[in-house]
């Protein structure tokens, strides 16, 4: 139960930070940002926006989180990430705190 609460808190934190980043963008979203939302496909994130998100998350959690492990797969950058994928990554990194 505690793990579920922690995971939900991480998801809400990621959503809050993403919403803060896109608040001035003129997005016509069909649905609210959720764990199923993809950064590039749904929110039109650029690579710079993804870097800003990573920095904001590191500042929020007050530690380096080695996002290169999430952003690269088989030596290539991933094409897109969902809020859920980011949250799962964060949960695995924060377990050792």
Where are these regions (language model features)?
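Phosphopantetheine-dependent thiolation modules in NRPS/PKS and related acyl-activating systems
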Residues: 2-45, 49-55, 59, 63-97
């Amino acid at each position: 139960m505690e793990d579920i609460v922690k995971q939900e808190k991480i998801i809400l934190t990621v959503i809050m930070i993403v919403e803060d980043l896109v608040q001035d963008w003129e997005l016509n979203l069909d649905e609210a940002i959720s764990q199923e939302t993809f950064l590039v496909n749904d929110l039109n994130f650029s690579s710079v926006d993804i870097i800003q998100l990573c920095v904001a998350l590191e500042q929020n959690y007050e530690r380096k989180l080695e996002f290169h492990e999430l952003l690269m797969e088989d030596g290539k950058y991933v094409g897109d990430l969902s809020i859920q994928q980011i949250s799962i990554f964060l949960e695995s990194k924060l377990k050792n705190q």
